[in-house]
Amino acid sequence: MTFDKFIIWLMAIGILLGAGDRLLKNRFGLGQKFEEGLNAMGPLALSMVGIVSLSPVISNILGPIIIPFYKFLGADPAMFASILANDMGGYQLALSLGENKEIALFSGLIVASMLGCTIVFSIPVALGLIEEKDKEFFAKGLLIGLSTIPLGSIVGGLVMKINIKILLINIIPIILISLMLILGLKFFQGKMIKGVLYFGKFIMWMSTIGLAAAAFESLTGVVLIKGMAPITEGMSVVVNIGIVLLGTFPILTLIINLLDKPLRKLGKNIGLDSTSVAGIIFSLANSIPVFKMLKDMNNKGKIINVAWLVAATSTLGAHLGFTAGVESEMIIPVILSKLFAGVSAVIIALIFTRNTTEKKSI
């Protein structure tokens, strides 16, 4: 049995465990996670289906601009799609723009799960949840996390067995975008953050308009936006992901419980408080609780947590579920790339925070 199939079987067992615990009135906390997996389909549909339906339209509009530019760089146009999160249209747009399916999968599933997720999800969501006094630490962690995305991407590409020369050429746009974000956050933090927030709102508008237009066309047959994919295409992807998430969340709960003690011991050895260690564990499932917990971490923990979650967020949660739902053979490359980039970011953050005071900011 391959590792990909092992993961799928593990998720399937998680479904049975979650369903069984639900019948036992959530005695072990797995029944609730089973329900959360199904409930995740609503938010997923809101963020995904509109962009999926609009992907052919976006491809037709941007193609004449993006394709020549990326060809000039020697890269596949699919790499452009990595500025969107994998589960927020990045995967579908990569397939629409891509000339090489292997590179499209690399961009839409690996790079988009780190770079795109940071741009359209992590930054906008975090800035709405963290306190003003923590924005300095958030920015520092963000800079470190962004710097390791190209490293994680290379690892993922090598695991996919992409030719090293082709891989390095296609990494160039990612390095350029990461560098622009790093320099922008370093020297024009306010303007850069405002720009990212506007971009996030633009994506939300696009997904809402796309969803409404596709739903209207499905019910009436009247085409509002020419060239859109049918709404059923996006909905079928959401359903596939939802099935996987039914088992992902219960299994993830068990994994987090297993990792809790060893990670807390490790955290104590490197100067992290218990909240910081919990944040690292929770972000493997979802980063939203971590942003809410940031105020209770010591300064070192804040920087390390943000650096880690830039790439590692949802590695064993929604991103695993999404990958398993659309391209199960990509599970290993996605997991390894995100973890490698995340661990690399933590190592760099530990070096940079050696002299950081452990006292919580006031």
Spans of features found by a protein language model:
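Intrinsically disordered, low-complexity segments enriched in Gly and acidic/Ser/Thr residues
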Residues: 248, 262-268, 275-280, 285
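Helix-loop-helix hairpins and the membrane-proximal interhelical loops
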Residues: 32, 36-76, 83, 99-102, ...
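Alpha-helical membrane segments and immediately flanking helix-loop junctions
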Residues: 73-148, 273-327
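A generic alpha-helix surface/boundary motif
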Residues: 14, 64, 91-92, 121, ...
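A generic, lipid-embedded transmembrane alpha helix
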Residues: 42-59, 86-92, 149-152, 286, ...
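Signature of multi-pass transmembrane helix bundles
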Residues: 1-50, 107-115, 120-247, 321-362
